[in-house]
Amino acid sequence: MNNMRILIAIVLLAFCIAIVPARAERVYLDITAQDVRKVVVAVPWFSSPSAPAGDEKEGKPMADLLSQGLAFHGFIQVVDSQKYGGRNDADWKALGVDYVVMSKFETAGSGMTIEGRLLDVREDKMMAGRRYRGESKQSEDMVLRLCDSMIEEFTGTPGISRSRVAYVSDGTGRKEVYVADALGRGHRQVTKHQHLVVSPRFSPDGNYLAYSSYHTGNQNLYLTDLRQSKVTNAVSRRKGMNLAPAWSPDGKTMIVTLSKDGSPDLYLIDREGQVKERLTSGAAINVSASWSPDGNSIVFVSDRSGTPQVYLMDLKSRNAQRLTFEGKENSEPTWSPKGDLIAFSSLRNGQYHIYTMNPANPKSVQQVSSGWGDCEAPTWSPDGKQIAFSRRGQGKKQIWVMLKDGREMRLLYNVKGNQSYPQWTKAVD
C-alpha cells in the first residue's frame, strides 16, 4: 500500500521538544464561537537545497496545496503569497499575520522528505514542527498530512484535508457513485451499473461502501471494497426495497429499510445480509436510520404521525420518541460523530433547508443553511465541525459544505452533471 511507504509516525523536531509545552497546557481555538475572527496564516513557498526560498517552480505548488487545505477548515485566512513574493523572510507583523508555516523539502533519488514548522508571529517562537518521509510521487499526501497536523496545533483535533466524500453524479448520463477527497482531488467512479444508484454509505473504517442500485429492476443493496473497486457483493436482493444502509459504529452490522414483508421497515442485518432483528413494524414507512456514536440509539424517519418526521429510538428498550414537530416534513437525519447534534433536512415555506438539533433537547432546533435553492441530504465531516449537503437550484444540483453553524457556506465540487447523496468519511492510511 502506497501510504504505508510514508513514515507516518510524525517526527517531532528537536527544537520543538524544548519549546512546546505539554499538550495539557495548550489553549486551543474554539472555531465554533460565532464572534471568533479568522486566524491569519502565511504559507511561504517550500524551499529546498535545490530550490532556493522564493523559487516558484519547485516550492509554490506544495505551498498552494497546503494553503488550500488550511483554508478549507473555515477558520483560517491564508495571506496571498504574491504579497510577499512567496519568501519566508517577510515582515509578518506588517502584513497582519498571526502564524507562518515555514516548510521545506528535499529529494534523494525517488524519495522525498517534507518538513514544516509553525511560527507564532506575536510570540516570535516556533510552536511545532513535523517531518514526513516518502516517495516523491506521494508529495501531495505528505503536504496534506502536514496540513492536518497544523490544524491539530490550532484546535486540538487533526484536520480533515485528506478525508473523502462519496456522492452520486449523473455526469456520464447515468447516476453512479464517485469518491473524491475533501479538496476535490482524485474524483473516481466507483460503480458502473449504468442505472440509478442511491444512498452510498461508508463503513466506519472507510474501506467499504454500501449503496442501493436499480440495475436489475429491483432496488438491491450492494457492498464494494474500495481497496479493490471490482470486488462488489450483493448484500440484499429481497423483493422490494433494500435501501439506505446505516453502519453500526463497530462496522459489523447495518440497519436497512426492507419492504419484503409489506410496509418499509427497519431491519438489523449483518454484512452478509442476514436479518438479525426487525426494529420497526406497522403500516407506517420507516427509513433513513443513523446510529449514535456510542451505538446505543438511532434516529430515523417515520410517517406514523401522518407526515415524515424524525424519531429517536433507544436500541435496548426499542422505545421511540418523536423529535421534530415543525415543518411540513423532516427527513435524512444524520448523527454527528461527536454525538452532540443531529443534522436533518426540513421542508418549511416551500423550501428545504438543513437544521441541527441536540437529540436530548428537541427545542434546540436551529436552521443552519440559508439562501437560494433546496438544501438536503446532510452529512457530517469526520471531526464533526462541518456539514456537506446537496443543494438544488439555478438549474443544477451540487454538493456544498459549511461549518456546522452555517458559516462559510461554499461549493465543494464543481464537476460535470448533477451531484447528490453526499457521504463523508475519514482518510484511510
Residue ranges and their predicted role:
Residues 26-27, 85-149:
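Amphipathic beta-strand/beta-sheet edge segments enriched in Tyr/Trp
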Residues 30-95, 101, 105-107:
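Short beta-strand->alpha-helix linker/helix-N-cap micro-motif
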Residues 122, 181-185, 225-229, 270-274, ...:
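Short loop/turn segments that connect beta-strands within beta-propeller blades
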Residues 158, 169-176, 192-195, 212-221, ...:
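A flexible loop/linker signature enriched in serine peptidases of the S9 family
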Residues 159-161, 204-205, 249-250, 293-294, ...:
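Residue-level detector of Asp-centered blade-edge/turn motifs that repeat once per structural unit
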Residues 165, 206-209, 251-255, 295-299, ...:
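Hydrophobic beta-strand positions that form the internal "hydrophobic ladder"
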Residues 394-429:
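Blade-level signature of beta-propeller repeat domains, shared across WD40, Kelch, NHL, RCC1
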